Structure formats: structure tokens, C-alpha cells
């Protein structure tokens, strides 16, 4: 498995369009494993294609267990789309592997529904999820649409990041 470098904000790759994945093969499985390894090495819970210079619509997520361990909740989302945002808008502390050393409070919907394909190309849905998983889904899928969590901050806070 290959651990790759995480692309750091404000790299222009984050603003480029990403392409849907249409071939579901061993190369895609290897890409997802490489993404997990890179995410774990950098102590993350989610990683999107553009963060490793892959302008493809792929996201990997692994929400830690209560004891902080990872590996039991590995999820790969291919061509994910948020189809519904529900509930209150909640504020939570977020960070990003592409913005190392910085965290801030960000507002997101408390629940979401996401449609995606798995590694076999089968269509799947996470329906009305909440908590950290919902926040992580919204955060990572934002990457696929050229948005980072820092885009939700005030201009003054963003300017301090450069």
C-alpha cells in the first residue's frame, strides 16, 4: 500500500472539478486502501480524492470507536451526493488534513442523507444520519464540490491562514 502526501490548502486542485468514477476495479480498491493508509498516517477520520491530488469523486471515512481506535468502521463512498439536509444547523469544531494545525467552529446541518456507490458499483444510501458521521460526510463531500471548511469562516479568519 502506498501512503501519499496530503495536498495543503490553498492549492488550486481544491477548486478544480472532479470526475465521476465509472470503472470499479482493483485499481479503485487500491486507491481506496491508499487513501485509508494516508488518512490513518495523518490521524484523520475522512479523506477525499482531491486531498491526495486525485480529482475523482471518492471519499473514505472511518469514525473512531469510543476508545479512539479505527479500522472497524471503514466506509468508501464513490460518486457521493448529499440528497437531503435536515434538522437544526449545529456548530461544531472541525479540522482538515489539508489545513494542518488549524481548527475552528463551523455550522452544518445536524442530519443528512447521502446516496453513493460502493466499491462494486452498487447504489447505496445512508439515510438521515446524524452526529459526527453526518458532519464528516458533509465535510468530505464538500471537498468534491471545491469547498473546504475554511470557506465557511469569515474572510478575516481565512486571510490569516495564508
Question: What name fits each language-model region?
Answer:
Residues 1-162:
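Positively charged
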Amino acid at each position: 500500500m502506498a501512503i501519499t502526501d496530503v495536498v495543503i490548502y490553498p492549492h488550486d486542485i481544491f477548486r478544480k472539478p472532479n470526475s465521476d468514477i465509472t470503472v470499479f476495479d482493483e485499481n479503485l480498491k487500491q486507491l481506496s486502501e491508499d487513501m485509508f493508509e494516508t488518512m490513518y498516517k495523518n490521524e484523520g477520520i475522512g479523506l477525499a480524492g482531491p486531498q491526495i491530488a486525485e480529482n475523482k469523486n471518492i471519499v473514505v471515512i472511518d469514525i473512531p470507536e469510543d476508545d479512539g481506535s479505527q479500522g472497524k468502521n471503514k466506509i468508501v463512498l464513490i460518486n457521493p451526493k448529499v440528497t437531503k439536509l435536515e434538522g437544526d444547523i449545529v456548530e461544531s469544531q472541525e479540522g482538515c488534513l489539508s489545513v494542518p494545525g488549524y481548527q475552528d467552529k463551523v455550522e452544518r446541518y445536524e442530519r443528512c442523507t447521502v446516496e453513493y456507490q460502493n466499491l462494486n458499483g452498487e447504489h447505496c444510501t445512508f439515510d438521515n444520519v446524524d452526529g459526527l458521521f453526518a458532519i464528516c460526510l458533509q465535510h468530505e463531500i464538500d471537498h468534491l464540490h471545491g469547498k473546504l471548511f475554511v470557506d465557511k469562516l469569515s474572510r478575516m479568519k481565512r486571510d490569516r491562514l495564508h
